[in-house]
Amino acid sequence: KRYYESRKLPMTLEDAIEITNDDGTLKEVKYEFVELRLGNHCNVMCRTCNPYSSSRWVKEWDVIYPEEPVIKEHISQKNINWPLEQDFWDKLIKYCDKLKVLYINGGEPFLIDKHFSFLQTLVERGISKDIEIVYSTNCTIINHTYEDIWKEFKSVQFMLSIDDIGERNEYIRTYTKWPKVLDF
């Protein structure tokens, strides 16, 4: 991901100085790259994951690590429901006129339909053709009804989280079915 970011959005020291005031503040807040980590709502329980990125881990993590209240507080539903709040999306859109890359992950981003309303707003504002969308997904869910929205963007890429093939992938990524991953 870092390679992708530095290749797509290179910024030199001169670029940084040009957009910065003498006191270190930005002259204007306009996002070129936005990463939307849409909470931890996920349909998979990967052995390499944790409750920060997968809601499927919350109950077991509670049993395994009962002494970690900081984790419990961090992953509580009240801290991860922000993707469902319209106020967040209304504030974000104000800074997206110069947006070039929108990186969307989760949990599993395709479980959070609210972000498609945001994409539609970018289309309605006439800025979608300059924006690349990049999804990080576990390849178990795709909603093809949104393809019409995606066509309005410069490009849509999918970074696929696959740890192995067949039964080994199903073992590592509990609740996945390999044939469904192949259908993605």
Which residues fall in each region the model found?
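Alpha-helix-centered segments that form part of catalytic cores
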Residues: 84-92
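Generic hydrophobic, helix-prone segments enriched in Leu/Val/Ile
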Residues: 20, 92, 96-99
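Short cysteine clusters
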Residues: 1, 42, 46-49
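Core AdoMet radical
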Residues: 29-41, 52-84, 97-115, 125-144, ...
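Generic structural signal for well-ordered alpha-helices
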Residues: 89, 119, 146-147, 182
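Flexible, acidic/Gly-rich N-terminal and inter-domain linker regions that tether
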Residues: 1-32, 52
